[in-house]
Amino acid sequence: MAWYAYCISEKQAFPELARHRKPVPMQDLTGISGNQIFLYPASDLAVIVSEHNPAEDLNHQAAKDHARVVGDCFKMSTVLPFRFGTVFADDEALRRSIRSNQRHYATHVERLRGKAEMHLRVMVDDCCLPQPVRASGAKETVGKEYLSSLRETASRQRERQTKGRAISVQMQRLFVPQDEEITCRTIDNGKLLLDISHLIDAKCVERYQNKFATTRELLKDCQMQLSGPWPPYHFVQRLTRPHATAAGIPA
């Protein structure tokens, strides 16, 4: 029987596993397609799974169900989320994957215990909008204008990187996260968008939210959005490569 995997958690967080070596149903929790969620014991860990039919379509609703299950488990314990679509072909494949990655999983559980992820979206005006294209009057100038355009593009990119780096440093100093993941890109409306994930102590969520409220009032030139707390999706190292039938890939 194939298993669909949602996340890894600590076995000690689920007293019902103390006397069982086989999968135990989780009460009042269903997964993709309404399937029963099981706690699958594996040494000191518990893998949260549901039975999986390979013919099932893992669609948008399935992705929402995956996130819901991970979120519900996060309320109870430390979790290492699996990537959406992670499937183990059978019991042996699941056990083999956990055994081979046991030390890595245990290390990540220890590092992320009591932690939560907060997500900031910061939007600012692009510091260097593209210049209007100048009409070329002679063929011999085309090459020079092309090289000039390349230099201007490279210069604008460096300026964007500098501005993005300055904003990320400012956010780091304001929120003082334990770890962070940042992406920066330009969007169609001429804005620079930073997606910032901060890892913080779960007990400090309210303080973080208060800091966000005051920061948004201070930084009038930034459009800021906050979401969370979330399971630590961005701070789980990808330990193995993806396969058609996955061998256990935390997201």
Residue ranges: model-predicted function:
Residues 1-251:
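An interfacial alpha-helical scaffold signature
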